[in-house]
Amino acid sequence: MKSAVETLNPTRVRLTVEVPFEELKDSLDAAYKKINQQVTVKGFRKGKIPARVIDQRFGRGAVLEEAVNDALPKFYTEAVNEAELNPLGQPEVDITELKDGETLNFTAEVDVRPTIEIPDYSGIEVEVDAVEVSDEDVEKAVTELRERFASTSPVERAAEDGDVVTLDLEAKVDGEVLEDGVAEGVSYTIGSGELLDGIDDAVKGLEAGGETTFTSELKGGSAAGKEAEVTVKVSQVAARELPELDDDFAQLASEFDTLEELKADSRKRLENMKQYDQATQAQERVLEKLLELAEVPVPEKLLEDEINTRKHNLEHHQLGQMGLDLEKYLEIQGKTVEEFDAETKEAAVKGIKTQFVLDELVNKEKLNVNQEELTEHLMRRAASSGMSPDQFAQAVVEGGQVPMLVGEVARGKALAVVVEAATVKDTNGEIVDLDDEDETESTPETTEAAEAAEESTEDKPEA
């Protein structure tokens, strides 16, 4: 076999392959054997039909077609390996010449990973939010904790903001009660915004036994996005009573003895949360700068497939679970189809570029993933998917997606290398030190930042 490669553009090549006919012998033998098992000829036992009889009865062309179909993947793979290519997706194969007893010639066009020059990233500078926790932040956190320990007691008066009401609901569209539009005994805190638009105004002022009707656009269910006539009946009004903010409350709501200790712990927790957000922000902005510096051509077919994958995942998984179609989703978002398509393409391009650049950086820095890192990442992914670690691991193995997880961790480590080399300042002009670990150690934040940019570039395990 002889092969040559022609570069059509930075992301696509054409392989030209010439195969001497004698190298098709194994495939021809396999073709005769396969046809032997599929056909019957009077006078011959199944599987014992001579080759010349098959040629006479079914045509030599049928045998050659079967042999070529069997041989093409092998010769294509050999040509790819000889040229040291990294193909993306399936090739477009064209048989240019097939002469019985002489030769098989074909071409194969395929997208390939582009050659990427990793830029000097040591000069990257980004700005992030400063970690600042005010007294008001602490008071808000303590108040939210206090709200969780509130008690309720029924009252004989009209409902008002902050009350907990027990409701019976019935929704009609075009005069018909929806199958999924009836609910009884729903507990709702007035002002929380957790139910339908307009329900707060509807129930305020009603006492137990009171009933009213209002209109609201349904956000989910079988009639999502439609205007519904909602009848609401109040069966109980209960006032919420908050515990006193004192040392007794601190002992009730936490492991601390005093309110001051509880507030100090709340401040520390808020600082930790803001530091986490700050680190994530730094990683996302460093990645954006890196992608701006790198020249990364994107294969057209890969981009097309990625856009289609993202749209499919949105329509058939995310929106399907919400009871929405794409048209209604865009209406809620206030976007046109053109705006949605542009945003989807932009996200797909970023995802592909992120994977290409970080993969190249993994190779350049010779980064490896050990078993402990892979296990930790698997545990995080399992938790975020709502599956147990064992279930998630089984889904990954059965789906042949272990290399995908390894790639995610490796790219997280590559991003960590770039973040380590970057200068990160907060909005106060202070240098932010994110170097709590070895520079080549991936953190949950760097891995998640890389994943967020890639999003659906690779298949994900399904529950």
Curated annotation (Swiss-Prot):
Catalytic class of the enzyme: isomerase
Domain called PPIase FKBP-type: residue spans: 162-243
Keyword vocabulary terms for this entry: Cell cycle, Cell division, Chaperone, Cytoplasm, Isomerase, Rotamase
SUPFAM superfamilies hit by this protein: FKBP-like, Triger factor/SurA peptide-binding domain-like, Trigger factor ribosome-binding domain
UniProt GO BP: 'de novo' cotranslational protein folding; cell division; chaperone-mediated protein folding; protein transport; protein unfolding
Major localisation: cytoplasm
Signal peptide start-end: none
Swiss-Prot/TrEMBL catalytic activity: [protein]-peptidylproline (omega=180) = [protein]-peptidylproline (omega=0)
Keyword match Cytoplasm: yes
Region (Disordered) residue spans: 427-463
Gene Ontology cellular component annotations, sorted alphabetically: cytoplasm
Compartments, as annotated in UniProt: Cytoplasm
UniProt-listed InterPro entries: PPIase_dom_sf, PPIase_FKBP_dom, Trig_fac, Trigger_fac_C, Trigger_fac_C_sf, Trigger_fac_ribosome-bd_bac, Trigger_fac_ribosome-bd_sf, Trigger_fact/SurA_dom_sf
Record's compositionally biased regions (Acidic residues): 432-442
The EC number(s) this enzyme carries: 5.2.1.8
Record GO terms (molecular function): peptidyl-prolyl cis-trans isomerase activity; protein folding chaperone; ribosome binding
Keyword Isomerase: yes
Pfam families reported for this sequence: FKBP_C, Trigger_C, Trigger_N
PANTHER family linked: TRIGGER FACTOR CHAPERONE AND PEPTIDYL-PROLYL CIS/TRANS ISOMERASE, TRIGGER FACTOR-LIKE PROTEIN TIG, CHLOROPLASTIC
Similarity section: Belongs to the FKBP-type PPIase family. Tig subfamily.
Written domain comment of the UniProt record: Consists of 3 domains; the N-terminus binds the ribosome, the middle domain has PPIase activity, while the C-terminus has intrinsic chaperone activity on its own.
Annotated function: Involved in protein export. Acts as a chaperone by maintaining the newly synthesized protein in an open conformation. Functions as a peptidyl-prolyl cis-trans isomerase.
Protein name: Trigger factor
Originating species: Streptomyces avermitilis (strain ATCC 31267 / DSM 46492 / JCM 5070 / NBRC 14893 / NCIMB 12804 / NRRL 8165 / MA-4680)
Taxonomy of the source species: Bacteria, Bacillati, Actinomycetota, Actinomycetes, Kitasatosporales
Protein encoded by which gene: tig
